[in-house]
Amino acid sequence: MGRTLEKVLIKNDDDIFSAEKGYILPNQIRCVEIEALVDTGASYLCLPPKVIKELGLRFAKSTPVKTGSGIYDLRIFKGAEITIKDRTIEMQVMENINDNVPPLIGYLVLEMMDWVVDPKNQTIMGNPLNDGKWVMDMY
């Protein structure tokens, strides 16, 4: 067992919409590719403040969050398109406490994309209950 790191591509969903409507060029879509630590104890995709600023994501709300060092009011941002391997979702992201905390891939992202952690190979893989295919739950 060890640390599982995965590449994540994050795009500003508002920019994607603007490019689709012809308001901006596709190469003007703000995006960042990062390596993030898979952390099944975290809820959201958690990003350093400088990455959120670079992406230009919209503030949604602040919420109390339990961390290993106590409870903090952290900010949630909307308008992120998240791609890991060949799967893409749109969801809110959480801002890390500071820029020194690494990006984290939380369990909500894993569940929405139907990924499971393979600790032996230090990677994520498609859910074996669904033969590795991306299958969503309705109930």
Description of each model-found segment:
Residues 1-139:
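Pepsin/retropepsin-fold aspartyl endopeptidases
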